[in-house]
Amino acid sequence: MSHSNAPELHPQIVDPFHNVTYRPGKLLGKGGFAYVYEFHDVNSDSSYACKITPRSALQKKKYYDKFVTEVTIHRGLVHPNICRVLNVFKDQMNYYIILEKCNGGTLTDLIRRRKHLTETEARFFSKRILNALWYLHDLYIIHRDIKTSNIFLMEDFDVKVGDFGLAVKCETPEELHWTMCGTPNFLPSEVIYSHIMKRKASGRGPDPNLDEDCVNLCHQLLPAYSGQGHSFSADMWSFGCLVFSMIYGRPPFEAADIKTTYKRIVRCDFSFPGSISVSEDLKNFIKGLLTPDPRKRFTVKECLDHSWLNPSKYFIPESLPPRIISEPYEVPPLCSASPTRNMQMTINMAKNAGGTDGRFIAATPQAIGGTEHIPTPGTANFYKPQNAILTTKSAAGISRASTAMAMQNVGSAQGVVNKYGINEAEYPQIDPPCYIMSWVDYSNRYGFAYQISNGSIGVIFNDESAAILSPNALIVDYSPSLLDAAFDRALFEEGTTILSEKKFKLLSFFRDYLENRSIVPIPAADRPKEDEELKRVIEQERMNNQEIDFKRLTKGLPLPQLFLKKWKLYDDGTLCLLFNTKVFQVNFADHSKVVVAHRSVTFMSEKREIYTYPSEYLKDDRFSFKELRRRVDRARKYYEIIKAARPVDSLAQYRYNKDSTKKSASGSSTRQLGQGGE
């Protein structure tokens, strides 16, 4: 294990926090300051990839901050097409990031062995990479280093996007960044131009590889907007370079030296080699991605809607066989003969499997309010980021019924047209967001308490303060004023310094009350073993008279946790709820509910049926679910009212309405989701 500048490794590496011992194996790769080794758990013999960064390499603050940013972003991502961070720890010599191991190598390895891939194979990989990018961009994360060597493959060739060393999380969708970073062959033109303009504004010259000719070309050829920073569209340019590389075996702007490469990027100087015959749809797809103006460049949604990825026009396999390592994938004859016939075959297969509308579904839902029968939309195949330590198992999944539908729908939506005439492959799969399952209104005395579907309990007290109890009831976040929303964190135990004794007892009471009245209470047996480990670490630090750093011990849990920011209860029983994430929920008087999230709308009927649709459906004239449209329109009107209100306007009605004789009112979701929601 002797490698130049490689980190010093002992025969056994111990993670004291999780009490796991690893045995280092072979070197898998390296880049920058980090080295990636194969690690074996000596107890279970499970294999992982471990990214190791020597502490000596992070002595400068900017390098350490960059490392912290990478870990913070990456460990919060949970998606089937993103390489998962399983653990992070350190010893006296190194920092260790334990990752799921991708035994299929990288996309670069596959291209080198094959020289180039077929369009069918490229479609398979592109769909999965786009799913990952949709997820990242939905979280306001720019990867900034999309390239073939950062696309890791499992043994079955499933895709895992990795290496978030250059990633950045934006506060708003409009936020722009100026840092020139990435891999030269995959660098978008606006990254180059923005770097030049920022250096010019500070009186400094550009990067040595950007010569005077390149600077002049930027001013002559690129729109002024491109010099103002880069955003999510930078990932789409890099993705275009990646697609080109899959088909032709090399990046589109590759040259003998970096200076020439940069000038070719600025000129958008690339061509499609005639030696490989490709479809016009592919050429149009790549051109739409390699567009110099980032405002006109294809978005993830436009890519997924493009004819090159249309499963009714082109066959897109659900999996690839092992032999593609050495030979092209052959499209099955029945699939290549006729796209129309291919789609009809898929629909017939779905119907034969029990679906009434050409989908694999568990059962046909009952009519809602006597309106119409509604087929279930494609249920999610991936999960939202959750903290790894502080979430109960029962707070980690959607309903059994919804899960069953999800498992049946995985991989079956390609080319399937639902009741509304909408090809479900046109829209990304989603799952229900977290929502408030049950609540109790004691604002005539104490405040408003609620239980979220992730298992946490929250209270908005009458003095405008707020507390959120983590799903495992170990950690509490508290803010003395919702107007400021500045939260402190502590252990949830008697004598805690951030909560008064009265509020501690009230939060304990509301927790017991809400969990006991839930349809499916969270069983104590489902608390994860990490809870006990967290307790053990805290007790050990107390014995050693160490100051307990809750931010360190609970860094997988956002501060603050998801909490209710505003609420309003109307006389007719309609309850409006606004989260700090801007997710908005309306509980209607007939016990149906609507949850409006950033990219989805969830409808819960009074009969406990749950449907989650992409928000884009509401813009599609073919989507004829009139009842949902009507309720979403009502929800939007409520939203405009509540967003302008103070956090505790609802409480004020009890303070100043002396004629009110209302006692406490309470409500519970008519649900079949149990305590879950990932």
Swiss-Prot record:
User: Which InterPro entries does this chain map to?
Assistant: Kinase-like_dom_sf (IPR011009), POLO_box_1 (IPR033701), POLO_box_2 (IPR033695), POLO_box_dom (IPR000959), POLO_box_dom_sf (IPR036947), Prot_kinase_dom (IPR000719), Protein_kinase_ATP_BS (IPR017441), Ser/Thr_kinase_AS (IPR008271)
Is Transmembrane tagged as a keyword? no
Please give one Gene Ontology molecular function term for this protein.
protein kinase activity
Q: Which reaction does it catalyse?
A: L-seryl-[protein] + ATP = O-phospho-L-seryl-[protein] + ADP + H(+); L-threonyl-[protein] + ATP = O-phospho-L-threonyl-[protein] + ADP + H(+)
How activity is controlled: the entry says:
Inhibited by GW843286X (GW), an ATP-competitive inhibitor. Inhibition leads to reduced growth, increased number of cells with more than four nuclei, increased number of cells with condensed nuclei, cell cycle arrest at G2/M or G1/S phase depending on the treatment time with GW, and increased length of membrane-bound portions of the caudal and anterior flagella.
Q: GO cellular-component terms in the record?
A: axoneme; ciliary basal body; ciliary tip; left anterior basal body; left anterior flagellum; left caudal basal body; left caudal flagellum; left posteriolateral basal body
What range(s) does the Protein kinase domain occupy?
22-309
The UniProt record gives the binding positions of ATP as L28, G29, K30, G31, G32, F33, A34, Y35, V36, K51
What do we know about how this protein assembles, alone or with others?
Interacts with Kin-13.
Give the protein family.
Answer: Belongs to the protein kinase superfamily. Ser/Thr protein kinase family. CDC5/Polo subfamily.
PANTHER family listed in its UniProt record = CELL CYCLE SERINE_THREONINE-PROTEIN KINASE CDC5_MSD2, SERINE/THREONINE-PROTEIN KINASE PLK
Q: What is this protein called?
A: Serine/threonine-protein kinase PLK
What are the top taxonomic ranks of the organism?
Answer: Eukaryota, Metamonada, Diplomonadida, Hexamitidae, Giardiinae
